[in-house]
Amino acid sequence: MAIRQLPEILINQIAAGEVVERPASVVKELVENALDAGATRVDIELEEGGVRLIRIRDNGGGIAPDELPLAVSRHATSKIASLDDLETVATLGFRGEALPSIASVSRFTLTSRRHDAEHGSALEIDGGRLGEVVPRAHAPGTTVEVRELFFNVPARRKFLRAERTELGHIEEWLRSLALARPDVELRVSHNGKPSRRYKPGDLYSDARLGETLGDDFARQALRVDHSGAGLRLHGWVAQPHYSRASTDQQYLYVNGRSVRDRSVAHAVKMAYGDVLFHGRQPAYVLFLELDPARVDVNVHPAKHEVRFREARLIHDFVYRTLQDALAHTRAGVTPNSIGSDGAGDPGATAGGLGNIAGSGVPNHGNAAGSSGSGYNYASWTPSQTPLGLRVDEARAAYSALYAPPPSSAQQSAGMPSMAGTGLPATAQDSGVPPLGYAVAQLHGIYILAENAEGLIVVDMHAAHERIGYERLKNAHDSIGLHAQPLLVPMTLAVGEREADTAEREAETLATLGFEITRAGPQSLHVRSIPALLANAEPEALLRDVLGDLREHGQSRRIASARDELLSTMACHGAVRANRRLTVPEMNALLRDMEATERSGQCNHGRPTWARFTLSDIDRWFLRGR
């Protein structure tokens, strides 16, 4: 068969197969063009899920009449002019493929007016066939109409889903955009009816976060903001107990561009580690900012993916930032309301990095809807170091420390003193710590405590398990991983890529407890293994570690295996169900929870405590109605 030059229309239709997957792809490309043009308001009109009509109207800079035909030509763009521009591109679009690709598979109309022009101009394209530029009344800005998407490519049109499904994809992308660009007003209508409006606001305002991901996420989000090595990571991560069955609330933006990146997703999952219940997914909205020259955005035609020039550094930066933020969450801590004072300050965090820099105790804001006294828990700090693994070892000290003095009213009325019970005189006592004071034990499993806001219920085994686990980890971290030499070196047959990785990462492997030398093109000599994991399967473990090093530049397999062992030890050492605790012992456990990192979840990701405010309890009994 002879080689022939393809016609321009067919070339554009082939390109549309990569750029225009469904109506949501069209909306994405057109709205990104509007934002690159400086628009502060974008109206999106849809019919039949975007298949019959997509109309995007913006108030951006507009296009000159003589540039309209050029705007729908392949690889014509105002955003880059050289390779240097491509390597440092900061705009959302730059390839010059979207408009001609969309126009080749639809009935397309482009109308625009510059702010200094007397009137607008319009250009119609029918299935890739270019019309004439004609004058048309139009407000400053640009309107793009896309009718009958894929009308001339029936094979593509039959693969489109139901109207509701296609509309859902558009709405999901608009949610992602609304999180990244809160300064832009977005108005959406479907089949002639308004369906969504995102009002302009501040990045750290609760309005945009709440209306996109829900008020529950906004209440449970920890704000993070950390910079270093020319990188900045800021945004929100949900507390571990706010987890999802799917990845539907995971948003990553690199220099303002919504992307998917396996390395960053892996770093986030690692950071949640042993605080996330099995099979659950974390929720987050993260913005990573770095020099555009350090990231390649010209990887995918739809620009969904990026390639970092320092992938290992990015992975480690994200992991350590989020791990630090999550590590400093403690039982009794409620994230600050997003709309509270300092909400507009990127450095103001809720249990995140901004708080932990200056204090060992996070800021304890009042829970939303609580009927407490408004006492600022940030003023309360434990007055002693944490206990050992057994809560009864210092019960006398705790009893003396936390027993409130009798009030003068009690003494004058002849009422018995509450000293020695571990209970405050009233629930509104300004000295009440976050988890309050124990009042009873329920079925030998749960501790019931009263704090300034209401009732606290603690799973005593889960809580004590986490306390012991964190102490075991800290003890082992202080002495490091010891290597245990093998009497007979083990020869391991591996692939050539694995052998190259082992040779290149010899120093990293040594810090993990492995002493490895290359024995041949596809074999390794293993002379020592981590002592703590001597009874594990070193061959399988080493293969997993090498796979992680090759894929992500680092591995936590050893640490994870060690943590699993320590978790088992802590579980066996924790207080068991049906063991009766005295009130001072229960108070000792509560104080240790408040001083222990990640104490909101046990080693397996289950919650260790729950709060019921007075407002919640009042609703149970219909009080105040």
From Swiss-Prot:
Coiled-coil stretches: none
Highest taxon listed in the record's lineage: Bacteria
Molecular function via GO: ATP binding; ATP hydrolysis activity; ATP-dependent DNA damage sensor activity; mismatched DNA binding
Keywords in alphabetical order: DNA damage, DNA repair
InterPro entries: DNA_mismatch_repair_CS, DNA_mismatch_repair_MutL, DNA_mismatch_S5_2-like, HATPase_C_sf, MutL/Mlh/PMS, MutL/Mlh/Pms-like, MutL_C, MutL_C_dimsub
GO cellular component assignments: mismatch repair complex
Pfam family, one: HATPase_c_3
Gene Ontology BP term (one): mismatch repair
Biased composition (Gly residues): 341-356
Region (Disordered) location: 333-356
Record keyword Iron-sulfur present: no
Function: This protein is involved in the repair of mismatches in DNA. It is required for dam-dependent methyl-directed DNA mismatch repair. May act as a 'molecular matchmaker', a protein that promotes the formation of a stable complex between two or more DNA-binding proteins in an ATP-dependent manner without itself being part of a final effector complex.
Similarity section: Belongs to the DNA mismatch repair MutL/HexB family.
Protein name as catalogued: DNA mismatch repair protein MutL
